[in-house]
Amino acid sequence: MISSETKHMQNYINGKWVDAKSGKQEVIPNPATGETIATVTISDVEDVDMAVAAAKEVFPEWSDIPVPNRTRYLLDYWKLLQDNKEELAKIITLENGKSLRDAQGEVQRGIEVVELATSTPSMMMGDALPSIAKGIDGSIWRYPLGVVAGITPFNFPMMVPLWMFPLAIACGNTFVLKTSERTPILAERLVELFYEAGFPKGVLNLVHGGKEVVNRFLTHPDIEAVSFVGSEPVAKHVYQTGTAHGKRVQALAGAKNHAVVMPDCDVEKTIQGVLGAAFGSSGERCMACSVVAVVDDIADEFLEKLVKETKKLRVGDGMDDSNFIGPVIRESHKERVLSYIDSGVDEGAHLLVDGRKIKEETPDGYYVGATIFDHVTQDMKIWQDEIFAPVLSVVRVSDLEEGIRVTNQSKFANGAVIYTNSGKSAQQFRNRIDAGMIGVNVNVPAPMAFFSFAGNKASFYGDLGTNGKDGVQFYTRKKVVTERWF
């Protein structure tokens, strides 16, 4: 249950809740009110070393358990997550700020990833070919890597960790997790439920902290692989540093997702889709729609209706079901977002909806309202940068060809969407867009867990994405066996 008392969040290492050796801690506010709800211990190198040692010690025992038996633990974990869905969603809203509706959606998507991980035995199966030569057979086997680490962001404190450790652990690895130090309460609950499911101690370890923890993950000789989700500059650092130290790395980075709106789209459904994609979760998601490229023929009609509907969106505490947009994560991030809105005005974009001017029921919360700019061009910062907020830029284009060109000019290529009723236009868009995840009349083209999740260009550093077969391949190594018997 959620308590009104201030909590103190600790590391979980080798079966025990412990404070970091440094004694450092940070304050965790409720973004909706600014009130302190928790403190969190902040780790350094020594704490990471302890967590890795615990994971390394239990690895031989854990990896020796047959894979069907390992996944049975996950079935129990899945059941516990299901039984605690409402509590988990409320924790997310409390410390992240997103609406309870969005938090409930995140919880469900996270549980679906655990469902996927329970099918690990079939996904780990290798290949075999008999009689590759006279009396000789060939086969491919998959084995776990050892100790692996995960670094996850504040914006999806449940779903993203569950992209990582359930699948990695089902494959036979042991895990050290660093969630965002901004959302430690949900991390604690995920670990508590994990061990309620009966997993041996040391299989999953949790360390809170900042760049010292990240850099130790990247250089620790006993960590075999690192999964990361976060901003583009850090993703690039994680990939370059980790691979330089011989580690397998997948680093999912930033985004500037475009939606191309064609004249033949269903206007009403498209507007509702854009509202959710741009302003849901306060725009703090790597699959948010942050740019709409609307074809001139429909632009005025589309924007008139979009602005009208946007102004109806309520801003406030995510615990209130009537509010569509909750706070952003911190006061510092709010100030950053406001500076981008100022920049858009200064650079000549037309401000149609101003999120700086909202009535705040809780003035100490970190609120930014839905914001829409029109006549945005590619030389403006609001088009170029990931703002991570409920700020939507509208670029007017002459046709599909220009819409594709504008979309592909972004350095990011995470997701992209087209709204159309033309199969020909959709096919052309799908084939020519650079993005790693594409939607056709799908507002947020985040795939189900049995598909891989990864972008292209500056949105992804690595080869294998998260989830699905990519996830299993990332968390295992192949051995090719050629054998003959006399």
From Swiss-Prot:
GO terms for molecular function: malonate-semialdehyde dehydrogenase (acetylating) activity; methylmalonate-semialdehyde dehydrogenase (acylating, NAD) activity. Its EC number is 1.2.1.27. InterPro entries: Ald_DH/histidinol_DH, Ald_DH_C, Ald_DH_CS_CYS, Ald_DH_N, Aldehyde_DH_dom, MeMal-semiAld_DH, MSDH_GmP_bac. It catalyses: 3-oxopropanoate + NAD(+) + CoA + H2O = hydrogencarbonate + acetyl-CoA + NADH + H(+); 2-methyl-3-oxopropanoate + NAD(+) + CoA + H2O = propanoyl-CoA + hydrogencarbonate + NADH + H(+). It is an enzyme of class 1 (oxidoreductase). Keywords: NAD, Oxidoreductase. It holds the Pfam family Aldedh. The active site is at C286. Pathway: Polyol metabolism; myo-inositol degradation into acetyl-CoA; acetyl-CoA from myo-inositol: step 7/7. One of its GO terms (biological process) is inositol catabolic process. SUPFAM superfamilies: ALDH-like. NAD(+) binds at F154, K178, E181, R182, S231, E386. Catalyzes the oxidation of malonate semialdehyde (MSA) and methylmalonate semialdehyde (MMSA) into acetyl-CoA and propanoyl-CoA, respectively. Is involved in a myo-inositol catabolic pathway. Bicarbonate, and not CO2, is the end-product of the enzymatic reaction. Homotetramer. Belongs to the aldehyde dehydrogenase family. IolA subfamily. This is Malonate-semialdehyde dehydrogenase 1. The gene is iolA1.
